[in-house]
């Protein structure tokens, strides 16, 4: 779960069209959110308030071994009008989870229409007690596509009582670059991320639409980082690849990543898929080419819908569903798109009707499998030599695929979830992490446990156990 200050920072990025997913450090953010999520330790309560549209404050009190806390302030040069308190904020915005990577053409259009982000800035500071530890952060937008990020920590337990990290970031639709300097060991780093291909360059005019693969909105990103510590003369190097796509038949996204560190010989691959609107599955495999050590990690998250009044939640009982449930719901809200859907439906062969299965508690679960089509979905009736017919059908298929993709994404964004259950395990480390996060009255609650197996007695041990309450106006 994000802290309130982290949430405000993300709201600033959204309002100024700064794409966090285009930064190299976030290339594996989806798998980290499902496998490496933090577990609260002890008892913690966080009370925050946005006094104006430009400023906010937060007070944190925790009890782990001893009573400690912190006091934080934040100031933004532009009004943060797109923020909400813990009572009204959606869990999708308050909790780290699956990230839907948008194609570069969509990012370009958003950045092009940006007006307010040229000179925006954010100031943040936090003081910890007991003790004299301080931390601060400055975000200054230099141009539409570049910004300066400075992070500082002052702690008497650190060398020279603190450290400072400076990021000079350039973020465009096609690529992103970061120049980093840290006072800790005089560390200098360079990060680059490049998005391969361009959605506008895909030209299917001369290809029959019946044999176009049923996947669209794919993004391939490749990046690398190079580090050099001048004080210890130690180098660092890593590279990563990310492939993200969405099925045009169901609209469900998936993301695959591959990360390599050639110096230590570490290779890591992840596969994450959003199996339904309310569930996500992730797997990760680590391997070391020098020691031949390997590890398999598995994790998932499952959202629960908020309790609704009778007949307020859409029920598909006693109805036949020929398309995906997400597509049907989206078309009901947008009747103007129904014509494209009906025309596409008549051109293709009839799909097998799928009955819904109703659970207790007025919850309806739709079978995610529509039919047993081939991946390329070849229909002999569409193999026409007429060029005009082929072009018309191509436009209809494109409109329908975009409708299904947008339907699933809008259904995820508009769903009212009350809680999320996360689970992850590692076979080699023999660690199990369980986390529950949800809304309780006007509070956001996070509670979980981390279990490990004692290597000597082979008995489970509690490594972490705690609960956290967050409240924000």
UniProtKB/Swiss-Prot annotation:
InterPro entries: Mdm10
Record Pfam families: MDM10
One GO BP annotation of this record: mitochondrion-endoplasmic reticulum membrane tethering
GO cellular component, one term: SAM complex
Main location: mitochondrion
Topology of the protein relative to the lipid bilayer: Multi-pass membrane protein
Swiss-Prot/TrEMBL keywords: Membrane, Mitochondrion, Mitochondrion outer membrane, Transmembrane, Transmembrane beta strand
Cellular location(s): Mitochondrion outer membrane
Domain of life: Eukaryota
Subunit structure: Component of the ER-mitochondria encounter structure (ERMES) or MDM complex, composed of MMM1, MDM10, MDM12 and MDM34. Associates with the mitochondrial outer membrane sorting assembly machinery SAM(core) complex.
Known function: Component of the ERMES/MDM complex, which serves as a molecular tether to connect the endoplasmic reticulum and mitochondria. Components of this complex are involved in the control of mitochondrial shape and protein biogenesis and may function in phospholipid exchange. MDM10 is involved in the late assembly steps of the general translocase of the mitochondrial outer membrane (TOM complex). Functions in the TOM40-specific route of the assembly of outer membrane beta-barrel proteins, including the association of TOM40 with the receptor TOM22 and small TOM proteins.
Similarity annotation: Belongs to the MDM10 family.
Domain notes: Lacks alpha-helical transmembrane segments, suggesting that it resides in the membrane via beta-sheet conformations similar to those predicted for other outer membrane proteins and porin.
Protein name per its UniProtKB record: Mitochondrial distribution and morphology protein 10
Source organism per UniProt: Candida albicans (strain WO-1) (Yeast)
Organism lineage string: Eukaryota, Fungi, Dikarya, Ascomycota, Saccharomycotina
